[in-house]
């Protein structure tokens, strides 16, 4: 894996040597993983594939990190995660933090014509510990219902920003949200 150091510094001016070493480790681990080997053998893989669909009157847009549709209509979606897992398992993290994303990705693939889809999370911290959630066109109604339920509080105006450590670096702090001034 090679990179243009000048371009790297331009894109990531605050990256430390530790950041660079972590990224290099993750890329190297991914390149040697079973999933990467599988993907290398597929024809017609698309990266950063945009999608858009509506649930009721709400437009949902996103991008698949990696998408492949087989001749049989089955789809593979791979989402790369750079989370530091620590003691957590990838499965625990997907259950706790990515349930809405799973449903949205599955809906996007199925509404886009796939007959079935494997939503696959590749945690680059442990690239061979993938998490796969599988769906078929028979799951469309339950997936839509789940996305509707997720959107309901937002559509009803019942949501607050969640302050976190990223707020300290936000250029829009106190302009778009109250950030750390909100009660926890």
Q: Where are the regions that the model predicts?
A:
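Acidic, low-complexity intrinsically disordered tails
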Residues: 183-184
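Polybasic (Lys/Arg-rich)
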Residues: 124, 137-172
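Mg2+/Mn2+-dependent nuclease catalytic core
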Residues: 56-145
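A non-catalytic, helix-rich entry segment at domain boundaries
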Residues: 1-50, 54
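Surface-exposed helix-capping loop/turn segments at secondary-structure junctions
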Residues: 1-4, 14-15, 37-38, 111-117, ...
């Amino acid at each position: 894996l090679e990179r243009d150091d000048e371009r790297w510094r331009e894109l990531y001016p605050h990256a430390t040597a530790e950041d660079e070493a972590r990224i290099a480790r993750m890329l190297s681990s991914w390149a040697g993983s079973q999933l990467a080997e599988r993907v290398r053998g597929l024809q017609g893989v698309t990266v950063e594939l945009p999608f858009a669909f509506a649930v009721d009157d709400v437009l949902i847009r996103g991008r698949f990190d990696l998408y492949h549709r087989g001749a049989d209509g089955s789809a593979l979606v791979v989402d790369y995660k750079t989370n530091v897992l620590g003691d957590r398992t990838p499965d625990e993290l997907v259950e706790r933090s990515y349930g809405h994303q799973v449903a949205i990705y599955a809906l996007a693939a199925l509404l886009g014509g796939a007959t079935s889809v494997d939503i696959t999370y590749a945690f680059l911290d442990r690239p061979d510990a993938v998490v796969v959630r599988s769906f078929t066109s028979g799951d469309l109604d339950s997936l839509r219902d789940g996305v509707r339920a997720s959107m309901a509080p937002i559509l009803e105006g019942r949501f607050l920003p969640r302050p976190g450590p990223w707020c300290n670096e936000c250029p829009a702090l106190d302009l778009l949200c109250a950030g750390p001034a909100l009660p926890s």
